[in-house]
């Protein structure tokens, strides 16, 4: 497996891999990453579809990319996906996945046309004082010292950040700035999360720094991700004859590890409560989704809280990874990520408006008609003075194909589930859907005498508790996550957010899909490059632009410095003023 860039490799079709007709594949899970791997197995690996098996412990595919209407409960989306135009693997695959809505076009075509016609932008990124604009006004609010802290992290070697927290590298000024408000709520970072991952994010998305305040850097699907992404992939795979095995838990995978060679030998299954075993040869490839950010998720209801379940059940992704990791040090250290759910949980809720009474409060903040079919909030609106640090969003409506006319379906989440609310004096984790809606309505500016009635009769709110949703953000070191294909591995790979691949960042659709592509390309030795992570961190134009944007447009020549430094800088500027370098510095407002 090797990385490539440019359209020479991107547009090429690889030859059929040697002996692929003799091989079979077994994939743990049916989340985005497993579906991606399966798609690459049949598209580029040209493996027979009937040789590809996906094991799903539940009755519905999709993993974390959900979007369902549960009978008697209502619409539920555990999360949302923020996409980027440089998700290179994602678009490499979705150009080949047919739309299930429009004949003759791909999922990428649909997505591209939609976001060209209706580009995303937020008209109100944050509120405070019960629905008033917080007037962050597109500013980061960083001093030169704060900017230097961020720059220092950007250039710090990875090994110096192992097991360090964000509070080890940022001081109170940065953590109290608009920059951190935008960043932590957009990506769900907590102050105690990994400084290494924070650095990787800065480098990965340096080209989007200017788009953080108004979220114009983001792209969104038309509907929820289950209907817009997962269902087209399922249909594509079913068209190849790929086999889905539902209600099938993978309870263990047994390996032979000796003399530098590692081989998966047996898959242990629990199929409808009956134990089964699949014996493996070197031609049987196993793709393992280890861990899982939505494991142990629990769904509440309008009148019921979502329970906090921290037990690692058999067949659970964490239990499976622990059993696998015990067999070889190269298989990672799951305990680094799943041992403290108080540090890794947060809650979300799906709000469905049932009549028109809440709509004006939404419209007052987003400054758009929510029923227009176009962008509504343009990404999350963060409630800056919320005790739960609530953020909420309404994407293009309808969010579900079967959504009744006149209803809106939105999503909110709170980073602090253990803190009493501002209006509802209970921790978010103890609240029913109605109570969470009441807290949200309070922050929208609904008059207090009307709040309970609106929450009860004008909305249906379904809470979800996710104990391990940010487990991958916990401080880590090299080796805590296994490589996608560990050294010496013969017939297996690790997939998803808890597999290690260079330069990309977790908690993104792209990271999952990238590990799926890398796994397939490595094990089948496919003769085509995997698109490298977008290289903006090496592009001097993006670096110059980000440096000025972080300073809210102030040129770097305006930095506070001693007179001798300013004198020397002036001399340098004079020398380069009429050169290409000088023009570049002027174009990006460095001078």
Language-model region placement:
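Extreme N-terminal leader/targeting segments of oxidoreductases
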Residues: 1-25, 43-51, 550-591
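Helical element adjacent to the flavin cofactor pocket in flavoenzyme catalytic cores
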Residues: 203-285, 290-291, 303-304, 309-318
